[in-house]
Regions:
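The alpha-helix within a helix-turn-helix
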Residues: 22, 33, 62
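A short, Lys/Arg-rich alpha-helix, primarily the initiator
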Residues: 1-27
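Short amphipathic recognition helices of helix-turn-helix/homeodomain-type DNA-binding modules
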Residues: 71-78
Length: 78
């Protein structure tokens, strides 16, 4: 059986959820980068798919946005 959730889909879900959560909280990527201890270039490179975030960074993002890591990877409908 083929796994239908491939890398590109998973990256898109993560990106969409981070953007949605930032919008809901009226926060920016600059704010997120400061809160997780990175610079804005790092976040921009993540968005352009130029690097893969470490598990440590994903956990920090979830903590700062006050969601579970699983929530970051769960596709939201609508």
């Amino acid at each position: 059986m083929k796994n239908t959730t491939n890398y590109e889909e998973t990256r898109k879900i993560l990106e969409d959820n981070i953007n949605r959560l930032l919008n809901e909280k009226d926060r920016s990527m600059a704010w997120l980068s400061r809160e997780i201890g990175t610079n804005e270039r790092y976040i921009a490179r993540l968005q352009r798919d130029e690097l893969v975030p470490s598990l440590q960074v994903i956990c920090k993002i979830a903590e700062v946005l006050r969601v579970s890591v699983a929530d970051l990877f769960t596709k939201k409908e609508g």
